């Protein structure tokens, strides 16, 4: 009789979905208040002028303007939203 021994089950086959972290608005892009600029774990980027930080370290715009990344001497990178000239009036 043709028999086949039962195959064992694989121990692989599971993976978690990515967390979609990273920079969402790059330098030079226009943002409006509430736009998410960076999603991160911990403080890889720090909030600068016109940028707020959520409890999960997400950086978001608090004013309309242009995004820029500033590198400080102590090695920290700050995300800044520079207001547009016409928006400052």
UniProtKB/Swiss-Prot annotation:
Record-level GO cellular component terms: cytosolic large ribosomal subunit
Classification via NCBIfam families: L27 (TIGR00062)
Protein's organism: Paramagnetospirillum magneticum (strain ATCC 700264 / AMB-1) (Magnetospirillum magneticum)
Name of the protein in its database record: Large ribosomal subunit protein bL27
Organism lineage string: Bacteria, Pseudomonadati, Pseudomonadota, Alphaproteobacteria, Rhodospirillales
Family annotation (PANTHER family): LARGE RIBOSOMAL SUBUNIT PROTEIN BL27M (PTHR15893:SF0), RIBOSOMAL PROTEIN L27 (PTHR15893)
Positions of region (Disordered): 1-20
A Pfam family reported for this protein in Swiss-Prot or TrEMBL: Ribosomal_L27
Top-level division of the source organism's lineage: Bacteria
GO MF annotations in UniProt: structural constituent of ribosome
Keyword field: Ribonucleoprotein, Ribosomal protein
């Amino acid at each position: 009789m043709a028999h086949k021994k039962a195959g064992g089950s694989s121990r692989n086959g599971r993976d978690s979905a990515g967390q979609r972290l990273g920079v969402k608005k790059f330098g030079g892009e226009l943002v409006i208040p509430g736009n998410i600029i960076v999603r991160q774990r911990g403080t890889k980027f720090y909030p600068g002028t016109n940028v707020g930080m959520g409890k999960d370290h997400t950086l978001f715009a608090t004013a309309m303007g242009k995004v820029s990344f500033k590198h400080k001497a102590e090695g920290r990178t700050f995300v800044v939203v520079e207001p547009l000239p016409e928006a400052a009036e």
